[in-house]
Amino acid sequence: DYYDMLTGQEIKNRDFALMVMDSRGRVEDGNVDFINKKDQSFPFGISTDYDKLKEETKDYYAKSDLLMVNLGDTYRLDEYKVNLNSKTYSRMKYRVYNQISDYIEYVFKMAGKNDTIYILGSFPSKLDYANNRRLAPLVRFDMSDTGKGLLLSSTTRRVGVFANLDMGVDILSRFGLKNSEMVGRPLANKAMANRDDYMAKEYKKIVAISSIRMSIINIYVAVISISWILGALALWQRDKLPKKHKKNILNFLKEMVKLGLIMPLAFLSAPILRPGSQVQITLAIVFMTFLLYILGNRLFKNDDLKQVGFFSILMILLIVIDSVI
C-alpha cells in the first residue's frame, strides 16, 4: 500500500496475490490485507509489520508446501524517493533494507534442508528503468546444495538470464508438477565461482544493447525505406534520369537495397566479436556490414542475384544455428 502523492488517495496494491490464485481467483490461505503498520520513519508513514510477518511466516510455513511473501517497503521507498534529499533517502533506505535483511535471516534459520528459497529482487527503480537497467535479480537457494553458480533456462539459452515465465514452471518442477498451459522452462544450475564478475559484465552488455537497439532499428528502417522508395521512383522515371549519371544512380540504389539485406545479418553476427559497450556494438555492426558486403562482392562479382541468394542463405543459417545452440 502507498499514497498517491498528487491526490493523497490510498492505493491498495494486491497484484502479488495473482501468483498464488487458482483459476477462479481464490487464495487458499494467507494474509493480503493486514500486514502493515504506521511508522513515520518509513516511506508514506507505512511499514511492513515485521514482527507480525515473522509470526505468520512461521505459522504458514508449518502448514503449507508453498509460501510467498511480498515486502512492499522497497516499492514504497522508490515511489517516495522524489520527496527526499540524498541524505534522508540514504537513511531511509538503510532502515528499510536492515529490516528486510533481518527478516530474510529469520527465514533462513527456519528453513529445512529440503527447502528451496527464492529471493526476487525489487523491480528496477524509475531511474534504472529509464537507463535501460530493467532486469530484476533472482537468487535461488537450494538448502541441500552448498555450491554456487548461475541459473539458466532453455527459454533464453543464456547463462544467468531467464524469462519471468520460467519462475512459475521451476517452482512447480520442485514439486514434480507440470502445467501444460505454462510456456516457460525449468531453471538449471551452472556452477561458476566468479559468477558476480561474470554477471556484471553480461549486464553491462545487456544495458548497452538495450540502449542502442532503437537507434539501430531506426537506421535499418530508414535505409530500407529510402532505398526501396528511391529505387521504385528511379525505375518509374528512369527515362528522365540524366544519361550521363543514369547507370551510376541505378547501381547505387541497387547496392542500397542489398545493404538492407546485409544489415540484419550484421546485427545477428556482430556478437561474435563480443562487444561490451555501445561504441563497441556500433563498431562491430559497421565492421560486419562491410565484411559481409565485401565477401558477397568478391565471391559473386557482378552477379547480383547470386549475392542476394548468398545473403539470404546466410540469414537462414544464422537463424537456424541461433535457435539450436
Which residue stretches match the model-derived regions?
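Soluble extramembrane regions of membrane proteins in the secretory/endomembrane system
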Residues: 1-212
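Acidic, Ser/Thr-rich low-complexity intrinsically disordered segments
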Residues: 194-237
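His/Asp/Glu-rich, glycine-adjacent segments
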Residues: 1-86, 222-275, 284-325
